[in-house]
């Protein structure tokens, strides 16, 4: 909207001018705990998946702590595969998924069309990583009846 209205030139400009700390539209984040988030997801019938853990800019030590805590709190899966990802990152995330007993998911982290996101491409789970969708309930077959 702000770009269309001429108040900013790009989405990055919107964040810089209006949504950054100290700017008019900034709202300080109010975070829940990982346990609270997982409980809400479970209460609503969902499966808790840790999204794009390779993008949190954490050291291996802190990423392992996050994954261990996530699993201890009842998280079921972690994103292992992304379309824009180095092969060694996918292999490392697969190792972590197996190490912490987490299922795998795949995703593009797609927010809007752009040239560098290949939506749905190069998404595969490495061997030994079970997919989170194996937990999804399958719809029941409804028998046809004569009326």
Which role does the model predict for each range below?
Residues 9, 32, 36-50, 54-147:
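Charged catalytic cores and adjacent phosphate/nucleic-acid-binding surfaces used
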Residues 3, 29-33:
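Short, charged low-complexity intrinsically disordered segments located at boundaries
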Residues 16-28:
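Surface-exposed cleft-lining segments at the edges of enzyme active sites
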Residues 1-17:
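Extended, charge-rich helix/loop segments that form flexible
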